[in-house]
Each structure stands twice: as structure tokens, then as C-alpha cells.
Amino acid sequence: MTPTLRRKLQALAERREELQHLLSDPDVVGNNDTFRTLSRELSQLEPVAVALEEEARAKADLATAEALRNDPEMRELAEEEIAAAQARLEQLDAQLASLLVPRDPRDDGNLFLEVRAGTGGDEAAIFAGDLFRMYARYAERQGWKVEIESDSPGEHGGYKEVVARVVGRGAYSRLKFESGTHRVQRVPATESQGRIHTSAATVAIIPEADDVEEITINPADLKVDTFRSSGAGGQHVNKTESAIRITHVPSGVVVECQTERSQHANRDKAMKRLKAQLLDTERSKAAAAEAQTRKLQVGSGDRSQRIRTYSFPQGRITDHRVEGLTLYDLPNIIEGDLDALIGRLLHEHQADELARLSDSP
């Protein structure tokens, strides 16, 4: 660990001691808001304190074992204890470094998943359907809930476009690096001569905003359309124009919702998603600017960026943002086994963040 990172850890340890003193102050205890805020900050620093205490014990164990190494009768045991202590210190070093990475406050929250067919006609729509099913099955493995808010089926299967809300603790933290253009290479079912076709679909991961009520939108900037659709209301929604399409004219952002029985409920859902998308657009611009400055690939937030290729003939998935990230496990991944892929992306992002922290004073 670099000296800079070590100094940051020491600062966190000192802040923890300060918080412990503050939380015993009667004035702080008597102020519910302040007490709650400081208690939350203290709980976030506890893992750092625990890891530092474990590190101190491991260093003491190492020193004791090294002192015993000079004793011929204890040398073999000492060597074993030295190896164990060094291995533990390496683990703790990595753990402490990861605890330094600033936590995204949105990580535990829900998200909106948007998948749209790109170039490739019917095959692109089928691929968009495959991607949506991949994420839905991954969500099921995680115990999350997937609620479709709007969809436009492809003529030969899949989706021209599908939007869903993914509900579950940690959903955004696991899927936030999936935004971008996904490309597929395979022989379509309709291809009689066995030629490989290339098509694409785009994925957008938008965190559900907790503070959407604080976002003010001028009603004059909105164009609201109603239409008939099928959905949760069954035949009822086919008879009434309960589905809602809202266009935010200044930005061009369009959202739809057609899953509820009433127009009012669909409008409420659509407005929440619109506000979340506008907020995410601003954050994405900032993330993209930072990524450009720091030459980052993972976490850039650029949805036009080609991030991944799925080569069915070779059973291979390549993520273009991380050098050497190619997995020959496409059949399982497309069925929702995304942990290995997501784990590599999270590790790369953590490395980027640690590099930034090391460069900062």
C-alpha cells in the first residue's frame, strides 16, 4: 500500500475516535438529526477500524514468529507462523485498500433497465430479448424483483425496446457497468446458408433516484400522450387509453409506462422514471468528463460506447473496457451467470479508484 493510502487510513481512524467522543456529548445526543448523521458515519468507519486492529495483531504475530526463528527447536513452527502472518497481512492490505474506495450512495438502490435493439433488424430485436432475459435471470439468482414498465416486442421475437424496474438490495452496485452497446456475432435462425451476422443492442442502467421529489420540471416542457396497450390491466387497458408517454422536450428524453390499470398510476411511474433519467444524465456527463480526463473505460457512463461482444460460434464473450477480459463461457453467461464477469469489472473499477486516491494529496 502506498504511503498516501496509508495516511488516508490513519485519517479515517482518527475521525472514528473523534466521532466516538462527539456521540458522547450531551448536546449531540439531544439533537436527533445530528446524532443520527454522526452514528451513520461512525458505522461506516467501523469496518476500517476492525481491519486496522486485525492488521496490528497480524504484525505482532509476525514479529513474535520472526523472533522464534533463531531458536533451532522452534524454527519449523516459526516458519509456518511467519507464512500464515504474511498471508494474512496481504489479505488485510487488500481489504483496507478496498475500504478506502468511496462508496457510491446509490449502490444499494433499485434501478431502471432499458434494452433497445440497434443495428441488425430482426436479429437485433432477438438479441435484445436475449440480453433482457440474461439480466432477468441474473436478478432472479440474486433474489431481486423485475417489473416490466413498457415493452415493444419484435416481429420475430425479442424486443425492439423493453424497460423494467429492478428491485433489490445492491442491484445498482452489480449492474451499473452494463450500460453501453452490446454486439453479437452468430448465425440467425432464419439464415439458411449458415452465414454469421453481426447485430447490436444498447443497454442503459439508470439508478432509481431517492430524491426525485426534489427535482422540479416545468410542466410546459412536457409533452404527454396517451395510448392503448396490453399490460397488467388485461382487456381493460385495451379499451381505454391508460398508457402514458411523456416527452421532456428540452432534452428529448421519452419515457413510457403501460403496466398499470389507471392512467394516473402510469403517469406517476413515468414521471418518476423521467426524473431519475434526467438526474442520471447529468451525473453521466460528469462521469464521462472525469473518465476522459483519467483515461478510464469502466464507469465512464457512455452508453454509445461498445463495451462487449458475444461471439456465439466461439462461445466467447469479450469485454472491450478491460484488457484481456475474455471469457469462454458464453452459454452460461447468457443464461444469467454473470458473477465472474461483473466481479472483474468491479475489480477494475476499484483499481481505477485506488489509483486516483494514490495520486491525490
From Swiss-Prot:
Claim: Cytoplasm is one of the keywords in the record: yes
PTM info: Methylated by PrmC. Methylation increases the termination efficiency of RF1.
Region annotation Disordered: where it falls in the sequence: 288-307
Localisation: Cytoplasm
Any Pfam family hit: RF-1
A GO MF term: translation release factor activity, codon specific
Keyword NADP (UniProt): no
Main location: cytoplasm
Top-level taxon: Bacteria
Family: Belongs to the prokaryotic/mitochondrial release factor family.
PANTHER family: LD18447P
Stated role: Peptide chain release factor 1 directs the termination of translation in response to the peptide chain termination codons UAG and UAA.
Protein name as annotated: Peptide chain release factor 1
Species name: Xanthomonas axonopodis pv. citri (strain 306)
